[in-house]
Regions:
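Extended alpha-helical scaffold and adjacent linker segments that couple domains
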Residues: 1-392
Length: 392
């Protein structure tokens, strides 16, 4: 028998199918198993299988990010709800970020912020974004293809479409597990850019995007995102009444409008990107309660009509954020308190021209006309004059 015939018989023995009707073949060496994986890896397309598996990996990666109310993976803007929830948007791989080419990522951010389907987005100030790094994206895609290839081999062995010996079957399973473990780390290294829409000047309609790198070497993704958001005040978890007062003073309190609705202010914070982004409504409620307990920040009331504040309070923390709560400019609140504490009628009014025997009058009545356009200045002046009389 020739050498060729012997080799032919040996190859048929090694690679022979278990039965004449069967199609699977046995692999004889590890090199053949590796080669099969490399061949299968080329079957998977970026826009189909690779993209789908990438979404699954990222879903696991951000599943523990409890800092946000919701997370969205590759979700178009019309499918992202337009409400008060704080949301993390994971941008699609084609919306990658590169220091020298940021346009694709920035366009993705601004598209979500501005639009909700065919309509304009109302709650624009509730979105933070996570973008992939262009340099690591190729590595992530290749790692996904390897994982898909090993998974297809393991699945074919399970369904008997591919026959391997026990050693090779175990090897395929171990390779799949090792690749999946590596895949999580590569995905975190790839999605390492936190993007935040910015509007520094409310009179300028143009929006910009600030970029913050995430440390992917040590901390978990959820803790790193939370730390970057808090440290850079992208999302505020505790707000001082000082900052609340300054925002109201800068944008809302006017000479002819010394009070502003707390609920309306919260609605504006959800909408306008130039205002601070609070984590939730409770943060504003806590700031209001702290501020209401002092005389330095604002007074509160529930209705303003006929130049009177119904339910007026100053230095009283017993308030609740609802549709009726008004926050009053502190100087106006002090002047209003002083004026109304002096015009309270006595329990037993004395006849005109007389006073109780041996006592000094303690109740005074009076009125003054104040120009509505300069009400703030006028009320402060009246209060100062009254205090000066009492102190004399």
């Amino acid at each position: 028998m020739s050498s060729f015939d012997k080799l032919h018989i040996k190859s048929k023995t090694v690679l022979a199918p278990p039965s004449a009707a069967a199609t699977p073949y046995r692999f004889d060496t590890r090199a053949n198993l590796r080669q099969e994986m490399e061949e299968r890896k080329q079957r998977f397309e970026d826009k189909k299988e690779v993209r789908g598996h990438m979404a699954e990996v990222l879903k696991k990666l951000v599943s523990n990010v409890a800092f946000f109310d919701n997370t969205h993976i590759f979700t178009p803007h019309h499918d992202v709800p337009d409400d008060s929830s704080l949301r993390l948007i994971v941008l699609a791989p084609e919306q990658f970020y590169l220091r020298t080419e940021s346009r694709l990522a920035f366009d993705g951010v601004l598209d979500h912020v501005r639009n909700h389907g065919a309509k304009s987005r109302y709650h624009s100030n509730r979105l933070i974004f996570l973008a992939p790094d262009h340099g690591v994206l190729t590595q992530l895609r290749d790692c996904i293809r390897i994982a898909l290839a090993w998974n297809s081999i393991v699945e074919d062995v399970r369904t008997m479409r591919l026959v391997l010996d026990n050693l090779q079957t175990q090897q395929a399973k171990e390779e799949l597990q090792a690749t999946e473990d590596v895949l999580q780390r590569v995905a975190q290294e790839c999605y390492k850019w936190l993007l935040c829409p910015v509007q520094n000047n409310p009179t300028v309609a143009k929006l910009t995007v600030d970029v913050f790198p995430l440390n992917t070497s040590g901390a978990t993704l959820e803790s790193e995102i939370e730390q970057v958001c808090i440290n850079n005040e992208l999302v505020i978890t505790a707000w001082s009444p000082i900052h609340l007062r300054e925002e109201l003073k800068k944008r809302y309190w006017k000479d002819n409008k010394p009070a502003f609705g707390a609920k309306a202010f919260w609605d504006d914070m959800l909408r306008y990107i130039y205002l601070p982004r609070l984590k939730n409504r409770s943060v504003l409620e806590q700031a209001i309660v702290k501020g209401a307990s002092s005389r330095d920040f604002f007074g509160t009331a529930y209705v303003y009509h006929d130049k009177k504040f119904d339910g007026f309070k100053l230095c009283d923390a017993n308030v609740q954020l609802d549709d009726t709560l008004l926050l009053i400019e502190p100087d106006i609140a002090k002047a209003y308190e002083a004026a109304h504490s002096l015009v309270t009628p006595s329990a037993e009014p004395t006849p005109p021209g007389s006073s109780p025997s041996g006592s000094t009058p303690r109740t005074f009545h009076g009125s003054v006309a104040i120009n509505a356009s300069t009400a703030k200045i006028g009320m402060v002046q009246v209060a100062e004059e009254i205090i000066a009389v009492l102190a004399a």
